[in-house]
Amino acid sequence: MAFNLKGRSLLTLKEYTPQEIRYLLDIAKQVKAERKAGIVHQRFVGKTIALIFEKRSTRTRCAFETAFGEEGGHPVFLSTDDIQLGAKESIEDTARVLGRMFDAIEFRGFKQETVEILAKYAGVPVYNGLTDEYHPTQVLADLMTIEEEFGSLKGRKLVFVGDGRNNMANTLAIGCAKMGMHYVINSPKELWPSESFIKEIKDMAAENGGTFELTSVPGEGLEGADAIYTDVWASMGEEAKAEERERLLRPYQVNEEMMKKTGRDDTIFLHCLPAVKGQEVTFEVIEGKQSRVWDQAENRKHTIKAVLIATLL
């Protein structure tokens, strides 16, 4: 079923229905197949997108640039050293100006408030390429990767091990709840999300036939998991907390012993990257036969292209 998403922004995934997320994943599957078959389209000829980056990036920047450029569009990279975003010019005014010059805007940075303001004032679609709170384009790629592996999403079990209140844990919670999956956070209680967020996700999951659970016992809740997911212990901008996180999260390292706790040989390992091998995950796991991190990375491009197609055409 097709949906009219033209003009929509992508800020958290909360604003998209399960059916709309399904639609985006179906487009992503189509464009990936086209790419592999050598089929070339020029869907974005004459269109431009501003790519604003407060935080450095490999996958997000490359995915947006290639997804847009392959379709004949013109991406323009703007670091916050290059523009006046929130410095000599307000975010609101920057949004208004860029909205007159570009067909869309991507923002990757610290505050969720910034991307929300851009979306409110730009008058064109705005995409969250990562903030401290949410990372929706990554989770679309994660969902695509899980579906490629197992053929479906509903009823699948994903366990996030590590910092349970970071942007990945938050957005995976939304994505899993929307798609009727069973989501578990295995994390120290000090790093659990807020009570209000937990309630919101539990209600969302129940509405769609999924579940949301949390446990603080290292390695607990992994039984029967289709996928185990982790992320760096100290996110960008949290370098000062690295030593404290090391102390808290060392028991939560994803290693071969933890992977075996699922009781399955076909459980896959996921990571949004970049990874600190030997810290949150061992070399043996991330480089092993159960790892799908490189498929995830590739799928960033296909899912981002799907979002662009759905919201710009």
From Swiss-Prot:
One GO biological process term: citrulline biosynthetic process
Reactions the enzyme catalyzes: carbamoyl phosphate + L-ornithine = L-citrulline + phosphate + H(+)
EC number: 2.1.3.3
This protein's UniProt keywords: Amino-acid biosynthesis, Arginine biosynthesis, Cytoplasm, Transferase
Binding site for L-ornithine: N167, D231, S235, M236
InterPro entries: Asp/Orn_carbamoyltranf_P-bd, Asp/Orn_carbamoylTrfase, Asp/Orn_carbamoylTrfase_sf, Asp_carbamoyltransf_Asp/Orn-bd, Orn/put_carbamltrans, OTCase_ArgI
Transmembrane segments: none
Pathway: Amino-acid biosynthesis; L-arginine biosynthesis; L-arginine from L-ornithine and carbamoyl phosphate: step 1/3
GO CC field: cytoplasm
Superkingdom as given in the UniProt entry: Bacteria
Class of the enzyme per the UniProt entry, highest EC level: transferase
Disulphide connectivity of cysteines: none
Record SUPFAM superfamilies: Aspartate/ornithine carbamoyltransferase
Cellular localization per UniProt: Cytoplasm
Molecular-function GO terms, alphabetical: amino acid binding; ornithine carbamoyltransferase activity
Residues that coordinate or bind carbamoyl phosphate: S57, T58, R59, T60, Q84, R108, H135, P136, T137, Q138, C272, L273, R300
Keyword Amino-acid biosynthesis set for record: yes
Protein family per UniProt: Belongs to the aspartate/ornithine carbamoyltransferase superfamily. OTCase family.
Role noted for this protein: Reversibly catalyzes the transfer of the carbamoyl group from carbamoyl phosphate (CP) to the N(epsilon) atom of ornithine (ORN) to produce L-citrulline.
Name of the protein this chain belongs to: Ornithine carbamoyltransferase
Organism name: Caldanaerobacter subterraneus subsp. tengcongensis (strain DSM 15242 / JCM 11007 / NBRC 100824 / MB4)
